[in-house]
């Protein structure tokens, strides 16, 4: 991808160096005007002709060949149901195996059972599955019939009007008209919308689960709402891509009769299954119909994964097959030897029709096949059916666990993959996203920096310290927090827009522009009179308390902006102009949709209920009390000077920003601390409106009075970052009023409405990492590009054209850039998400040239994405930096506790995030992924040789203090240490953490350094991958999963996590605020990260333990029962006969012993949930497969052989010498084996309930009831033998009772003795936990506390720090790294109050840096590492040129100035920080 972009950029530069002088045919062959209208490549493109009178013949030739809109999701018809269903069922190996045995049994020479008897089990299974498939298919048929019969208005060519027809009558090329609330019947290209702005609102919940509305706009050139769309006047040909399943990707162009082309994309495509909302009428032409629609192409079945236990079962099945082969071979050889003892043919041997007898060899071969029929149950085919039933029961229990239900979102766990529940108990590695997974993804605006001046928003930080108190005071308070300016305007309403020049301004009370509403009213048991909930608009996110100093400057900027068309503008780099552009960028540069609360989404809602009068009076009283506090506190507020330029004074105690010797400027009010007052616990209400606003109590009440008629605006955004920035701008009265595909309207603080022409929108993508909008300013008529994006990208695109002619401006911009970068580092270390805001003014001529190429790129089909990327990159350069924002994404509740528990469970946790390194590191400390006692290695490099050298040096350094605790594992020829290393000396070495970025990952993957990287990670307690792309995330997961052969789990909430989720053994999606892509691609979906704790530690452990022990029991049960028939062959001449009735053998597995294992697999609990949560280390039993592995399998097989010997030979010795018949001998054996197997099951059960007892007792009693009825009624059911009255006679024989009591005791005695030893002297964690569970609650809690104190000894660093000097413990450094003396100075003087944890004194920080880390160093291609510097406590060199402590920021610090030339950004540096 990188190579293709580089080549495209070179081609673009070559193409544009002559000033866009090429013609369209020279630049893009696809867009050549000489292209013939009919020369379309139908093999790679789809050509759609309209179904009207003009193009009907072309439509018949081309479009009639496309599939219709009728869907058929059924698998069968009445004629094909029986043969097709049988054909599908016999694709299963188990059914083929049984069919093979039935065919063998039908051969006269190998008939063991009656033919009807052998058919019965197979026919029963086939019939049950056939009925199930038939019912499911009939339901699909009913659904298809309902969908196909739905009505829609289709344009009829002959009648020349829309007529009501069925969905199944829709064809490609038809014109379809839809009303509000109708479902889109096919994939339709939007050609008309009744919305004045040419927009159609869609609800895509049926398609992707997202509830916020989407906008689709009419194809360019057709947006004329005042003119009704006439299909007969549409003569264009549509060329688009072939049908595919990409919901968000679509490209094509419309070729008009004059051979001009208009491009379109997914923004104009209405997908089948979506619902039209808030749009009266929408019309379009059908592009894809029926099974070719994107919705149908995405309608795949549930994902299938094979669990680890299932793979283990398949291996053991082969062992059983080998055992079956051996037993059959013994039977065949024994049969031949038995017959060989007769001198002549045995008297019971029957000749064939010709009088010939079988030879001994042929008779032995037939006996081999006969023994396969006889011992067929040795292969536990029914085990797979039991496993499916058990997993259904486990999923049911998961769904009904209230602890996995989130009340706030009204979501519970979803199990999308039903066959891997047991894998939840064997996870060894977890790969987690950060944003929305560890954090809430509820973005809160915290701080900002504008042209080098930092505004800490102290009052906003104080307000966020007590969100609960704010929420309880009602919604009325929120509307006052953005009323920072008094109403200065007269009556009247105006929207200001440029139509070739600026028009006079008119004042307005409010912005009354046409707004299409699409907010929703959600029912929560009562009618909410406040603003209904919308996406990313909780009270914490919407309410922003403005900074006092910035508030006054914003007012000046708004006044300057208002009069910028009547007087000469200030210099382009003035603070006032930059502030105005900054807030305009926050308001405009997004994709936020605007609606009003007075026009809810068109659905049937419940009428409002009357609210109690007392509640309203209380709210009014609270409101007046708050406003009184406001008016009192404002009298004590100080007035901050208003900056008009960068060099003006910023305050009496603050340095000027033009001074080279001073540090960056932080414009904070009052006694603002360096962290923005995050730790403040009080809130001065008077700081909300600002000291200079001059708003008295009466004015504060007047403002909302003037705008009572104005509908409350609400915003819906696809990204929470965008919503946070829009609400922040609104807090400063830069309000986004409306947005259409063509225009965006912003209301200024004075009430003036500016309507910008929205020329182009360059959406965000993961490659560019930014988005831009191109607008025309309504006052200056300038074309402006507003860009926002990651600082790692924006900083490299800054190059103001004014710097070429003005050296002073260049110096000033460099200082702004340097100080902004320092503020960004501060925000990142405080755990804030950062975005840079920039702008660019484009000449009209240059823009027109660029726009022509952009339109060509939009209209192309070949390399469309590449061409769009080229045009965007060409425009987004030479930017002017406006400022940056810091947005807080709070940790979810319970995340630190969950991570700590998962760690104690032996799970390795990696965080893979696209955020910048400093932000991710701070969040890692906050969520306890990294501890202040850890030694953290931070590797940043782009060069492969340097990366290899750093990895080698790091490994050498780590190995001096760590050595493998267990035997190393092989990894592709290399020795890999275990993940829990120990220490050479008696003292415990600090834990290791690794931080790595995306550039380094590229070097690792491209340089074949995966093995070294994995070897390093095995020593690390935590691994943090920053700036990683979705592809890199999936590559890391696959690398660890395949190379280390471990069980992996990926968890995320966004579309960028889909590849990572799909690559892991288990993928978990979080139902967050970034859509449902992650959930739809996951195996399990949860609402919060903290649910992962119980999901894995409790349900995961239970699911694995239950299923594993049930599988082992199934193998034991079948082998034990089959061996009874095998031992009998030694006493019947290996004839293949049985001493048990055939029907009794069938009933044994079908009824008598089938239900207890299923109940055991669903409900058994070896350890209680409370103990599992209190002792997470119990989870390791599943990781080590203690319940089901090769030793446990063979121990169970040996036990089965022993018990079968006892169950056969004790009755044999008892009845030896008697004259009983075969069934009288076999009935006690059958009864004893059933009793032994059920008692064995009872001994394995760890939890006893009434249901367990009823099932076991019921199975035992069922055996006697069925046997008594069968033996009394079935006289000739199994001729020539006669089981008549056998059980009745046995029940009157005391010997029967004696052996039925004695034999199971002898058979189960060894297992009972072994279980007793394990329970008394067992050293396993599970055995100890089971003992604790049996204690009373008080003693149990005390034992758990003692266990935790033993398992978690005090860190060795605590004792080491007592004897260590204040500067910290010094580790022996590798001899290959000299330490320069200047690197050992102490920079840790400042203190920290930020949310990140403080670094303790015994922590050692070291840095390895590459010579290429700054422009002053020579660019060296060698992989040597120059420096290993040991720093004092509190330091963390996040890059080689910076020495700022990780959690502290002081204006008094002197940092090394940053080289600001292009290409010197720290992304190009190579460093290793420890």
UniProtKB/Swiss-Prot annotation:
Residues 1459-1468 have a biased composition (Basic residues). Residues 114-115, 338-360, 1141-1142, 1214-1219, 1271-1294 are extracellular. The active site is at 433 (4-aspartylphosphate intermediate). Its main location: membrane. It is a multi-pass membrane protein. It is found in: Late endosome membrane; Lysosome membrane; Endoplasmic reticulum membrane. One of its GO terms (molecular function) is phosphatidylcholine flippase activity. Residues 1-92, 137-316, 382-1119, 1164-1192, 1241-1249, 1316-1474 are cytoplasmic. Residues 689-698, 1353-1366 have a biased composition (Low complexity). Autophosphorylated at the conserved aspartate of the P-type ATPase signature sequence. Mg(2+) binds at residues 433, 435, 1053, 1057. The keyword Transcription regulation does not apply. Residues 1401-1421 have a biased composition (Basic and acidic residues). Its EC number is 7.6.2.1. GO terms for cellular component: endoplasmic reticulum; endoplasmic reticulum membrane; late endosome membrane; lysosomal membrane; phospholipid-translocating ATPase complex. Pfam families: Cation_ATPase, PhoLip_ATPase_C, PhoLip_ATPase_N. Expressed in cortical neuron (at protein level). Keywords: ATP-binding, Endoplasmic reticulum, Endosome, Lysosome, Magnesium, Membrane, Metal-binding, Nucleotide-binding, Translocase, Transmembrane, Transmembrane helix. Belongs to the cation transport ATPase (P-type) (TC 3.A.3) family. Type IV subfamily. Catalytic component of a P4-ATPase flippase complex, which catalyzes the hydrolysis of ATP coupled to the transport of glucosylceramide (GlcCer) from the outer to the inner leaflet of lysosome membranes. Plays an important role in the maintenance of lysosome membrane integrity and function in cortical neurons. Component of a P4-ATPase flippase complex which consists of a catalytic alpha subunit ATP10B and an accessory beta subunit TMEM30A. This is Phospholipid-transporting ATPase VB. It comes from Mus musculus (Mouse).
